[in-house]
From Swiss-Prot:
Official protein name in the record: Nuclear transcription factor Y subunit nfyb-1
Organism: Caenorhabditis elegans
Gene Ontology BP, a term: regulation of gene expression
Molecular function GO labels: DNA binding; DNA-binding transcription activator activity, RNA polymerase II-specific; DNA-binding transcription factor activity, RNA polymerase II-specific; DNA-binding transcription repressor activity; protein heterodimerization activity
Observed effect of gene inactivation: RNAi-mediated knockdown results in ectopic expression of the homeobox protein egl-5 in the head region. RNAi-mediated knockdown results in ectopic expression of tbx-2 in the gut and seam cells of L4 stage larvae and adults. RNAi-mediated knockdown enhances the larval lethality phenotype of the tbx-2 bx59 mutant.
One cellular component term from this protein's GO annotations in UniProt: cytoplasm
Chain positions covered by the region annotation Disordered: 318-403
Amino acid sequence: MDPKPINEGMLLEDHDHGMPEEEEITEDDMNGIHNIEEDTRTISEIAMELHHPNKSQVLLDQERFLPIANVVRIMKTQMDPQAKLAKDAKECAQECVSEFISFIASEAAEICNITKRKTITADDLLTAMEATGFDNYAEPMRIFLQKYRQAHKITGPIHRTHPDYVRPPQFQMDPFVRPLFFDTEQGRRCTETQYVINGSEIVKNAPLGEEWNEQTGTLNTRADGYYMEEPMEPMPMEEVEIEEHEEIIEQDSLGAIALEQQGQMQIYVDPKTKQHFAAKETPNGMELYPLIIQDTPLQLENVSGPNQFVMNMPDGRAIPHGMGQEEPQPVSSSSVMRKIGQNPSSYAQQHHHVSHVEQHDDVEYEEEEEVDQVEEDTVPVPIAPRPAATRVQPKRTPTKRKK
C-alpha cells in the first residue's frame, strides 16, 4: 500500500495543533505589570529544569554549550601558535566547561534558595565548589576573589565556609585566607563586610571603616552589641573548650604569668608541634599564649615577702616564683669524666641517662662515688725491672795464614 501523501497544509495543521492560543497584550503588560499567577518554583528547581530538560523538549547545542569558537580561542592562548586542535578535543572541552558551569550554578542556586536570597554572588559559587568536592580549587579562587575586589575597590559579603568543606592536605599548613583592605575617599575599607543585602546593597551609614581590625584580620566588637567579633583562625589548630577561663593579672621579670580563673576559655592546639595556646581577648584583638602541660599538677601558694608565689613540686621541694636566689650551676658530664679518667663513650654505656632534675641533685654524690671507685681499682702493681739487653758478638773463624 502506498503511503498517503503529506502536503504542506497538513504539516501546518499538525504543527499548530496543541499550541496555546495567543494571549491579548494589555496596557498593563506594556508597562511591565503582568497579570499572571506568581511562580511558586524555587531558583534551584528552575536551574535543575534548565540543566536536565525533559526528553520531549528539544534543546539546541547553542543553548546547552558555550560557543565553541570562544572555547577554542581560550585553549589556543596556552598553546603553540603552530599547534592545531582536533575536532573531538574542541567538543570535549566545550562540553566539560559547559557542564561544570551548569553544575556549580545549580548548587549555588540551591544555597540561595536555602538562605532565601535571589542574587547569586561570587561567594555563593565558592561555597558551591566547597560543597561539591572541588576543594583544590575553592581556596585559590577565594584568594583571587580577594585580590580582584581589592584591585577594583569592591566590598562583598563575608565568606561562609560550607560545613562539609575540609581543607586539602597541601593547604593544611598554610594560614587561612584573610580579607584585604584598600583606601577610599571615605577611609580604609575591607573587601568583606557584613552590611551587605542580596550581594549588592550596603546598609546606609554603616561603620565600614571601624568594622575590621586590619592587624589581626578580625571583626571589631562594639559595646552596644550591634555586631560581634568573628576572629579568623591564625593557624590550623584544634579548638578545645574548658570550663575555666584564665585571665592574666600579673607578669614577673622572667615571663611567668599569674592567671585568674573566670568562666570559659578557648585553647588552641597545634597539630604539628602539639603546643597548646590560650586565647586572650585584648584591645588589639585575640592573642595566643603558649601553655606548658605537665604530668603532675603544681600547687601555687601566696606567701609574704618579695616572692609573691611559691610552687610546690611533686618531690617536696618549694621553688619561689620570683626566683630571687641564685640558681646552682650544673656540673657538666665532661668535667666529671676528666676527673675519672674514662672515655665519654664508655661512660655513657655503663650509666643510664638521668633527667635534668636528678642531675642537679645527685651529680655531686655520683662524682664522689666514681672517684672513690676509680681510686680503689687503680692500685699500683709492682713490676719487675727488665734486664738490660746484652749484645752478643758473632764468632769469627780464624783466617788461614798465607805461606
